[in-house]
Amino acid sequence: MKLTVVGCTGSMSGPFSPASSYLVQALGEDPQTGQERVFNVLMDLGPGSFGALWRYIDARKIDAVLFSHLHADHIADVVSLHVHRRWFPTGPLGPILLAGPDGLMDRVRGVDGVGPEETYAGEFTPHILTAGEPITVGPMTFTPYPANHTVPAFGFRVQGPSEGNPLEQVELAYTGDTDTCDSIIDMARGVKLLMSEAGFTKADKPRGVHLTGERAGAIAKEAGVELLVLTHIQPWTDPRVVIEEARMEWEGAISTAYAGATYTI
């Protein structure tokens, strides 16, 4: 599998990155043609991310979009995706899987500013996430785990073929937005890469909203991950501060996400 950071700024688009969006890719057999091809799945599609995605893939080739939760900084560019798929110059591109928490399509209509008569049937096949029920896209499996956030939210554990050896299965995990909770620790156990939000620093006191670097580091330590990548850092926060806080708990490999970063798993 390959993971590309399309956008990673916390809570909004920023001067150096769009808001949250992560592209996961893997080579597998197309069930319709029997030929091998690259499958493309997006986890979240925040403001500015759809345009940025064009730097990395042909946007017509998206197979699925999975939303960790329905806050605008993680879903707003679904409207751009809808317009692209409905009005592409050579004709409609057809529906793709759109998965998220309960209330998904009402939220999409709200962002789009349309009423219940809009079904998006030509662009999206909606699916409501259920904790522990995996979604399979090509050779990849995405299993949602409940997160600890202000609205219903999930993290994803992703299993798929190794880039180095397609016969080997490897795993990564993405927290979405969350504070510490047992289910997110379970999600991260033993993965090669944990993409963990760190939207707060130690100076931020509210709980049940975001992780700090320190709390993300503690999750990485307890879960036994190989690489911790900190993301969803606010544009006013120095990433070095978040790294320093994570180092209070985590002694392993660590980095901060940035737009365009790629990781082969």
Residue ranges of predicted features:
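Binuclear metal-dependent hydrolase catalytic cores
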Residues: 1-174, 179, 184-186, 243-265
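Cap/insert and terminal regions of metallo-dependent hydrolase folds
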Residues: 180-264
